[in-house]
Amino acid sequence: MKTLLVFLSFLTSISLHSQSSINAIDNYVCPPCNSSCDTIIFDKPGTCTHCAMPLITEKELKKKYPKNKKRKIAFYLQPGIEILDFAGPMEVFAYADFEIFTVSKTKESIISQGILTILPDYSIQDAPEADILAFFGGNAAQSFKDPEIIKWIQSQPNIEYHFSVCTGVFALANAGTLNGMTATTFHNALDGLEKNYPEITVVKDARFVDNGKVITTAGISAGIDGALHLVAKLQGFNEARKIAYHMEYDKWTPGEGINLSLDNPYDGFTNIPNLENYTGTYEYLDNTEVILKINSREKSLYAVVYKRNYPLFYLKKDKFINLNGDEITFIKDDNNRVIGFRSSRNYDTLYKKLK
């Protein structure tokens, strides 16, 4: 009897241990990227099959992304600010659904390049906390030597990323944020940055430099590249490509900068194998045809419909996704030759490869 009780106790402990092990198994999710995959749950680590973002555990999701929390980005605007410096990135972050607000030293209106009047949302006295601080060029040498502004930058708690465009880099340089890091700026300001801030390694031929949590860009239009890069880091490369397409900035060359960060949003996208196997002419809707060709600049595919190029975003082998979020799966025969594709919108239909 005693032996039986010991045996039953042993079985119970095994059962409890097994149950504990089952309960300890983590579910994995995609970091919020404002796509349908935000609600998909995965049973093992890896990348999202929809947007290709690295998966995180549900515990990490709750900790890093409180429910319905949008990333807040503060655009610091000074008198004389360069319009495209801030307007280009603002467009990118707006498409990415960031919560954007403007800050200046005071709430008085400022003039940008002598032509645009701007009324800031906040002054440095009443600005709310942000997740990202962004600074831009134009009259930067004078503005970013102001001790009140530098003190405000240094006093901001819980900043996740610092971002600068053009000579906005001097805000971060004067605040000490870039000490020991690598940076770039507007071409005419590179020598001054290198001479006056020896603690910063200055790069003279890069669209942007990513130190991990601090991103600096070259002048004016390069701010768009840097903003797309930050979106790629936070929401996935495919989301950044969609935004570039919608802005008709689809001549963007992804990753055309220096990435010193441990997280590279372009991993797995720059060397997609055998792209040429998918090219050709296929059947399409309403007895029309679609031509698939290589987009060599982005190392991906274009679908040509009615003479317009529509990007297809790579997910994994034989699987892409279009602008509408439809998954495109290429079907192969026994000899590993592509014979057509199926769309998740109507998976029963095989669109045959014609040539």
Q: Whereabouts are the PLM-identified features?
A:
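A conserved active-site-flanking secondary-structure segment within enzyme catalytic domains
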Residues: N179-D205
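Intrinsically disordered, low-complexity terminal tails/loops enriched in metal-binding residues
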Residues: S18-Y65
